[in-house]
Amino acid sequence: MQVRHFSSCRIVQAGKERFVPSSGTYPKGFKVGGFFTGVKKNAFNMDLAMLSSDKPCNAAAVFTTNVFKAAPVQVDRKILDVTQGKGIKTVVVNSGCANAVTGEGGIHDAQQMVKKADQVFGSESDLPASLVMSTGVIGQRLKIDKILKGIEEHAPAMKDDHEAWLNTAKGICTTDTFPKLMSQQFKIGDNTYTIAGLTKGAGMIHPRMATLLGFFATDAPVSASALGVALKHAADRSFNAISVDGDTSTNDTIVCLANGAAGGPEITETSASFPVFQDILTDFSSRLSQLVVRDGEGATKFVKISVNDAVSEQEAAKVAETVACSPLVKTALYGKDANWGRILCAVGYSGMQVEPTKTTVSFMPTDGSSELKLLVNGEPEQVDEARASEILDMEDLEIQINLGTGGGKNANFWTCDFSHEYVTINGDYRT
């Protein structure tokens, strides 16, 4: 049984340690930290995460499409509109309370967080320079006095080392069993840059961007408009291509800050270097978002759904999403049941252009061994049940679907299985 206390990543679950970095290289000019303020009951569980840049950043974000948008989502959208994504210095996140469906009082609380962060970390103009996020139980007001006090008291303790970044990742966790943090260096031309990203999520995960909370920071000099385009492109192929349970949160937000501290020419949408940066951000986002699936509530498997030879990338993505979100497919995976009829059923009701006599479905093992074909051009194969059982016993596996349209367009989607433990975790969420 996976024991998930509220914000359970203080003790990383056995087997998940390999996903937690022991070191990292982080972007210049940022200080971060994770702290306890009293929003959560247990003092060992951090509930405040802060990131601040020494100099103003260009910023972009993608938000939930749930109509019940949480207060911080509404506040952040207005801030990015009025600032046009320029002059942002700080991101403050509280965990333990979502500040969602909290009325005008919740909006006021989020605004108070912005004002306090601006007072503590400074603003270069009269416009707001801070963004805020919240995650936790919906429908409850923030313990705003504790949060405001925590922002002021803990700001001097923020640092730029690995431990500080890891604590920041811990500070945004709820039912996560491990903190999700990544960093990497990359080159564009003669310049070397660094990007760091952290995210949280294990349940209420489904693409409608964003699918969870997270933020990126880079010392590359990227314009605000270019950052927005690159982040949307990256999110559609990463955070919008994962699902744990099919539920889209009220609080979903991904923010990206670029402070340009590493120097070099500005990267704009028309720069020759822009496609390079966009590809780097997309790959980085994809790897980071997959950690959320690996930590899916009650999950025992990490599953990649690959759809090939569709008429368009959008149609391939929709077919992959439909299969990934099918409860019957997900429970069959948990039961190690090679019931490919459930996969085909989901493909058929995806609403996309599918020709049954051209469709092929296979299990692709991740150990390098040969694939197991289940259906070829609409004709069922004689499935080796023992071989199927071997593949389904693996933690990682791939379901490959070839639509045979001749269009040559592909898409990937990542999901996990549904277990008894998912019901237990969510049945006990508030207790």
From Swiss-Prot:
GO BP terms in the entry: L-arginine biosynthetic process; ornithine biosynthetic process
**A Pfam cross-reference name:** ArgJ
Q: What is catalysed by this protein? A: N(2)-acetyl-L-ornithine + L-glutamate = N-acetyl-L-glutamate + L-ornithine; L-glutamate + acetyl-CoA = N-acetyl-L-glutamate + CoA + H(+)
Kindly provide the PTM information from the record. The alpha and beta chains are autoproteolytically processed from a single precursor protein within the mitochondrion.
Q: In which pathway does it act?
A: Amino-acid biosynthesis; L-arginine biosynthesis; L-ornithine and N-acetyl-L-glutamate from L-glutamate and N(2)-acetyl-L-ornithine (cyclic): step 1/1; Amino-acid biosynthesis; L-arginine biosynthesis; N(2)-acetyl-L-ornithine from L-glutamate: step 1/4
Top-level class of the enzyme under EC nomenclature? transferase
* Membrane-spanning segments: none
Family matches, as SUPFAM superfamilies: DmpA/ArgJ-like (SSF56266)
Q: Which domain of life is it from?
A: Eukaryota
Annotated residues that bind substrate are located at T174, K200, T211, E297, N426, T431
Q: GO MF terms on file?
A: glutamate N-acetyltransferase activity; L-glutamate N-acetyltransferase activity
Q: Where is the active site?
A: T211
Site features described as Cleavage, chain residue numbers: A210, T211
Keywords annotated in UniProt: Acyltransferase, Amino-acid biosynthesis, Arginine biosynthesis, Autocatalytic cleavage, Mitochondrion, Multifunctional enzyme, Transferase
Similarity field: Belongs to the ArgJ family.
Its function, per the record, reads: Catalyzes two activities which are involved in the cyclic version of arginine biosynthesis: the synthesis of acetylglutamate from glutamate and acetyl-CoA, and of ornithine by transacetylation between acetylornithine and glutamate.
Q: What is this protein called?
A: Arginine biosynthesis bifunctional protein ArgJ, mitochondrial
Could you tell me which species this protein originates from?
Yarrowia lipolytica (strain CLIB 122 / E 150)
Traced from the root, the source organism's taxonomic lineage reads: Eukaryota, Fungi, Dikarya, Ascomycota, Saccharomycotina
